[in-house]
Amino acid sequence: MEIQWYPGHMAKAKRLLQSQLSKVDLVIELCDARLPLSSRNPALNELVRHKRRILLLCKADLAENGKTQEWLAYFKSRGVDAMAYDATPARTKQGKAFIATAAQSVVERGERRGMNKTVRAMVIGVPNVGKSTFINRLYGGSVTETGDRPGVTKSNRWVKVTPYLEVLDTPGMLWPKLNDQRAATRLAYIGTIRDAVYNQEELCVSLLEDLMTLRPTETMQRYKIKNADAKGYELLEEVCRGRGFLMRGGVLDMDRACSVVLDEFRAGKVGKLTLETAPKEEKPHAPETV
């Protein structure tokens, strides 16, 4: 199964994003804490590399705390200012302070000129990483449309979230060619890629195999899997029988099983799980930001 997804609105959004860069003081990049490396768009990274940037590891409540700390240390070693974030009030307060610190130099520059500078920040990231939810939390209400699916935001939009901070909500963007298919599969696990793009049964089988490697006890208990040695489609059949996903005549309801497994994983019901391990840095790396 090969996964590729780069619809026309993403290419258009990238061009619009480029046209807005000159107006931006700060870039706020969001990635998924469960996939801190694979959920960062290398094309966007190149596009904004000359801008002051901070990184938020979103949905941190769904990731393993210890591994999130390892990722934060890794990004720090690369000169990236990063913090773990989720949509709770406490984290939102920390996020506001984090942005304020990053924007301080812009504010001070305006004060030296006798101006009350409004900081303009661009929010970027892959689809369904939580950009619109993040902006709504900053604003303190529903100012942008959200949804638990990729592709909700289709155009760039400036939103004034405080008297001194204006943010640009941008559509989630992938890159034209997903060469690393292992990463593409994991992006599909977390809902970055539209469901219609891939074979749901193949994706679910792959996820179940990963869960049996990473969380065998929890996975077997949740889905009532009796055969610990089951592989491939045998796992999906075990889920159907264990959870009672049967149609008339005892036919296994594979579609329902796939939907449930994917939905429950994305909601964190199998437990906190980080799908990537932070690389070990042997020597200091050149900073990503300027």
Regions found by a protein language model. Give the residues of each.
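Helix-rich effector regions associated with P-loop NTPase G domains
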Residues: 1-27, 33-53, 60, 66, ...
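Canonical P-loop GTPase G-domain recognition
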Residues: 52-54, 61-125, 143, 245
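Glycine-rich phosphate-binding P-loop
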Residues: 121-140, 144, 170
